[in-house]
Amino acid sequence: MILGDRDLKYYLEKGWIKVEPIYGDSVRENGIDLRVGNEIARFKKTDKVFDPDNPDYSFFDVQRGEEFIISPHEHVLLVTEEYMKLPNDVMAFVNLRSTFARLGLFIPPTIVDAGFEGQLTIEVVGSSFPVKIRRGTRFLHLIFARTLTPVENPYQGKYQGQKGVTIPRFKL
């Protein structure tokens, strides 16, 4: 079952779903919009090979700021302003807001698992021209779905509780 605006307001009021900060225009007809945060991680251009068994995080350049320019076809990791927490019977589909998709920006299919808590880090792929994004701009739209029963194994992965832009983590 997809949660509509009334459902979402009720879940937020009861504290079953937490999104902080939440703004007057965040809850939409069938989801919640999330905003651009203050950090981005750029993928450095290199001919070196990244080895997940021996991760070298110098491949990433983490930047803080109020605005960012995403270069043509550049891949970046972007953090949301909001910190969220989902109950064990709600998951969310992450979508790019249509306005940014119409500019040629792209995000891969992304799901927020039931039981997740933290800020979202999302991959964004640049358009055919540079695009400026500003902190606080509504950028993502989350569609929440309730599972028929609470999940048996709520999310407890390596990104649980993440704050700030989070580069890939590998268990060694």
Curated annotation (Swiss-Prot):
- Top-level EC class as recorded in UniProt: hydrolase
Which family does this protein fall into? Belongs to the dCTP deaminase family.
Per the entry, what this protein does is: Catalyzes the deamination of dCTP to dUTP.
Q: Which residues form the active site?
A: 123
Instruction: Outline the subunit composition.
Output: Homotrimer.
Source gene? dcd
Q: In which pathway does it act?
A: Pyrimidine metabolism; dUMP biosynthesis; dUMP from dCTP (dUTP route): step 1/2
- How is this protein named in the record? dCTP deaminase
EC code(s) of this entry? 3.5.4.13
Q: What is one GO biological process annotated to this record?
A: dUTP biosynthetic process
Q: Does the keyword Hydrolase apply?
A: yes
